[in-house]
């Protein structure tokens, strides 16, 4: 069985890639429903390859299980798609009844809109209880997708300011009546120019 999302995110693919590799973004995506906490003391700034043990708490209060997030990345595919793959497994809680957990996230430029991101997310599960857990996981994925769409515009870096856009920079084009560097006022019809 599987749960999947296919979304257009209002941010460029580089920003989306940084976001899905961020434990902070993960925490914001699931909040306030689920609160992931590192079992290793603290989350890294950016997810790296390997295992990361996490405890999940409902509403930040009630432990609902642990998860081994086991990550690998494909960042340089010929088709330009970047992939993050979580092949981890539930460590405790109801999800341990699943026999398979395979989660893949793909980032690519949106077709015809290179400043936006095509985001694809697929979770495959199996086991005798998979049919019973499918709907709760599907619901959580819908929440996650809605949060991604909401948060994506905030993921971009602020643009670098050009030299004459920097605060306090003198562009030489003072507006009429605006104070100049020496405190006098510039008037567009000043005949002393």
Name each region found by the language model:
Residues 2-4, 64-70, 98-104:
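Short, surface-exposed coil-to-beta transition loops
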Residues 1-6, 13-15, 51, 83, ...:
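Intrinsic-disorder/low-complexity, polar/charged segments enriched in Ser/Thr/Lys/Arg/Asp/Glu/Gln
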Residues 8-12, 57-59, 108, 122-126:
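Solvent-exposed residues in well-ordered beta-strands and their adjoining turns
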Residues 150-173, 177, 181-193:
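Short, highly charged C-terminal tails/helix-capping segments
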Residues 28, 37-92:
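Glycine-rich portal/gate segments that line the openings of hydrophobic small-molecule binding cavities
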Residues 1-50, 192-193:
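Hydrophobic ligand-binding cavity/cleft-lining segments
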Residues 81-139:
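Beta-strand/loop substructures that line and gate deep hydrophobic ligand-binding cavities in soluble
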Residues 120-166:
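A conserved amphipathic terminal alpha-helix motif
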